[in-house]
Amino acid sequence: MLSLILTIFFVHVAIYLVNTVGATTIDTLLWILYLKLPTSTSRNARQQSRLKREVVQLKREMNNTSSQDEFAKWAKLRRKHDKAMDEYEAMNKKLTAQKTSFDWSVKIARWLSTNGLKIFLQFYYSKTPVFALPAGWFPFYVEWVLSFPRAPRGSVSVQVWNSVCATAIAVMAEIVTSMLLQLRSRSASPASTAKAQKAQ
């Protein structure tokens, strides 16, 4: 079983990743993966894309056919196009409803596994110390703040540890990002200098 310290840390890593990558990006990726599974929804998606190609093809043929010179052929293509368009729109509505339902399910699961778990841990372990502080190292008021609101004095509470983890992860991410940007600018700098020297 994972210790409380690491559990809270990994929950905050997950929250940070979801906030950084973006919930809609994750939802879209999960929808694409879901459509790869052998389900009725994936069959509907394949049928919808087939109907879309058919509608585009029929529209192209209609545009290439003169409505005055070849009216019978144009009218036949128009009827096929209208029928395919109606089927496409019906399938699109059905698929949109399924995607909306899927998105709600994913949002609920994502919230429960990140923020919901964080809130649960804060309430369930509110009186449990995350770890104990060495006796006599800190003054009374520092021990009181670190154990706020309900952990025993002389320990670190779940709420304080949550704040520490969230802040540490955000700061480390900023440091890593700035280092990567610095390295990228240094590696791009010699290449641009070499191009400038060749131009002279």
UniProtKB/Swiss-Prot annotation:
This is Protein get1. Its main location: endoplasmic reticulum. It comes from the Eukaryota. Interacts with get3. Residues 1-4, 132-155 are lumenal. GO terms for molecular function: protein-membrane adaptor activity. Required for the post-translational delivery of tail-anchored (TA) proteins to the endoplasmic reticulum. Acts as a membrane receptor for soluble get3, which recognizes and selectively binds the transmembrane domain of TA proteins in the cytosol. InterPro entries: Get1 (IPR028945), Get1_fungi (IPR027538), Helix_hairpin_bin_sf (IPR029012). Residues 42-100 form a coiled coil. It is a multi-pass membrane protein. It is found in: Endoplasmic reticulum membrane. Residues 25-110, 173-200 are cytoplasmic. Belongs to the WRB/GET1 family. The gene is get1. One of its GO terms (biological process) is tail-anchored membrane protein insertion into ER membrane. Keywords: Coiled coil, Endoplasmic reticulum, Membrane, Transmembrane, Transmembrane helix, Transport. Pfam families: CHD5. The chain crosses the membrane at residues 5-24, 111-131, 156-172. GO terms for cellular component: endoplasmic reticulum membrane; GET complex.
